[in-house]
């Protein structure tokens, strides 16, 4: 599954992307 995190540079994007990285379903993570 591909996931895109909008606003990854902001305060909410970083912890959110960390959570998604730990999730086994997520294979590709794109940050914008």
UniProtKB/Swiss-Prot annotation:
Belongs to the LDH/MDH superfamily. MDH type 1 family. GO terms for molecular function: L-malate dehydrogenase (NAD+) activity. One of its GO terms (biological process) is tricarboxylic acid cycle. It is an enzyme of class 1 (oxidoreductase). Keywords: NAD, Oxidoreductase, Tricarboxylic acid cycle. This is Malate dehydrogenase. It comes from the Eukaryota.
